[in-house]
Design a protein with these regions (language model features):
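Membrane-embedded alpha-helical segments and adjacent helix-loop junctions characteristic
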Residues: 1-95
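Interfacial loop/helix-cap signal at membrane boundaries in integral membrane proteins
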Residues: 1-14, 128-137, 178-180
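Alpha-helical scaffold segments in soluble metabolic enzymes
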Residues: 6, 26, 39, 82, ...
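Generic hydrophobic, helix-prone segments enriched in Leu/Val/Ile
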Residues: 7, 122-123, 134-135, 168-174
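Alpha-helical transmembrane segments and, especially, the helix-loop junctions at the ends
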Residues: 62-81, 93-159
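Long, contiguous bundles of hydrophobic transmembrane helices that form the permeation core
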Residues: 147-180
Length: 180
């Protein structure tokens, strides 16, 4: 009986996480269908008048939405795509900006689905709580920190793109994004 009980407890936690992600996706769909994303996109399109400002806004929005990395990708992508298209930021660059802020921000934010998952794996040996261990580990998350720094560095630098990203950005600036 104890094996069955243990399996149910473990599966219950995974089911809750799956339900959480599904509900976040549904929330994004409702916001999009209700016109919330389009309204924000229209407002932002009037305020953001350059590729640099559109990229920076994408990075900042990506850092503000730290509850879940999937929610971050759904929301930032839906909201910022029309703004970055208008300002001739390539879809490849938009995808990079979203991806490079989604998980890195979630893994260093104490209030996120990632934090809940990491904290649940920490053994309860009495030396410190899972939250204390998580908070102490934040400065050691160099990938996450450097990824976020790199996003803003690439947004600010005029010639920051290289390789295929530079080619995609050049194509977007010369041909626009009207065919996407």
């Amino acid at each position: 009986m104890s094996i069955v009980k243990g399996l149910i407890e473990k599966m219950g936690g995974n089911a809750a996480l799956l339900l959480f992600v599904v509900l976040l996706g549904a929330l994004v769909a409702v916001i999009t269908k209700a016109g919330g994303s389009a309204a924000y996109g229209s407002w932002a399109a009037g305020k953001l008048r350059s590729g640099t400002s559109a990229q920076l806004a994408t990075g900042f929005l990506g850092c503000l939405i730290f509850i879940d990395d999937y929610f971050n990708c759904f929301t930032v992508g839906t909201v910022m795509r029309p703004v970055t298209d208008k300002n001739k930021v390539s879809r490849e660059k938009l995808a990079y900006l979203i991806d490079a802020t989604a998980a890195p921000v979630c893994i260093i934010a104490p209030i996120s689905s990632w934090a809940a998952s990491v904290i649940s794996y920490y053994p309860t040996d009495g030396t410190m709580t899972g939250m204390q261990a998580f908070l102490r580990a934040i400065p050691m998350n160099l990938y996450a920190i450097l990824s976020i720094v790199m996003v803003f560095w690439l947004c600010i630098r005029k010639k920051g793109d290289f390789g295929p990203m530079a080619a995609a950005q050049r194509r977007a600036e010369e041909q626009g994004l009207q065919n996407l």
